[in-house]
Amino acid sequence: MLQVLKLFAAMCSIGLMAEIRSKSNKKFMLLSALGIFMVVDSHTWTAFNLFISFIPYNSFFMPMFVFISGYFNKVGSDTRLGKYTLKKMKTLLLPYAGISLAVFGLQFLINWFKLGEIQPVPSGYLLYVLENVITTGTSNSMATPMWFVITLFATLMIYALMKKLLGKVWNSYVMLAVFTCLHLGVIYLVKTVGPEALIYWLLPLKVLFFLPFLEMGIIYRDHLEGLHTKLTGGVKIGIMTVLLLFNMSRTMYLPNAYDVAFDDIGELAGFTSPYIVTPLISSIVGILFWLTLVDLIGKPVQESRFVNYMSCNTFWIMGFHIAFFNILNCILMFINEHIVDVLYFDTEFFKESEWYRWELVDGFKMAYVVIGILGPLGLKWVFDKLVMTVGKLFKKKTPQPQA
């Protein structure tokens, strides 16, 4: 039993991001916590408007996660690829499998509750899931955001292989230029051909899309962070103001204001801007804005234990928040059917879709944000306690060797 729990713990943890500890880099701790907050908020159709009128979440936050990974990336020509691959499998693929399996179980129970019957598993479902994992990266609908884990793993592995082969002659600025050209080529290809025709090429194309942001994180760490940190508060406010005005001007000349964003990057869709450079510019603007804001005003919350715990468990939030949205909907449906009418709660819509949100008043979106963050974190806390308790019980029962 203990070994099963330990294995599941490994599968549902995310290396350094899942340990109960205090992160030493407080700025990037806060940045990752803000990033996962934005993921949850965007899936509630934005309960909290964090500058999204100027810088929409979907214009930068997934590239920002890759930028953060790049900041901490230390691979080089001396990296042992076998050891590195095993490490990334443990910290990325095992958590992906564990969380996806757990969400599948929750989805089964939620569907049983809201439909009133057990849904049969379709024939060939496992093959369908495996195909999705290596294309879109999604194992099931309630774990849709976990596509990012597969893409991040592939991006890190391709980058490590290139750095291993070319590390001794590697120039970050030259490689950033190369990666940028490949990134623009991906956008052009997708807009020209369409993502539907590239379904089996989605994963390598997403890797090419994200590579420049990985290199940007490394360049920032090695060459720019010191300069950026030393800027005065007035200069940082000026930078943020210029970025907001710049994005505002972009929304004025694009066909639609929201063209600065790209909604469905997991399937390389949603690139509505006529310019292939738009996603790159939008991502740089968003990353630099929030990086500067965190550097400017982040210190009061950087010591928060809750923010630290949230940052350490971003993958739990990423994987479970939609399931907890649906748990809240199940509660509302039960109240609506057995206690008192919940005004305008659309039971039929909820039965058909995991993405239904009750929106009688706009402020109720906050309830989804709260449960989407506290639910997964509470589940993680209970899980950690369970593993620790069972571990202690088994340790006590283990016979000690005689002297």
Place the predicted regions along the sequence by residue.
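Alpha-helical transmembrane segments and their immediate juxtamembrane cytosolic regions
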Residues: M1-A403
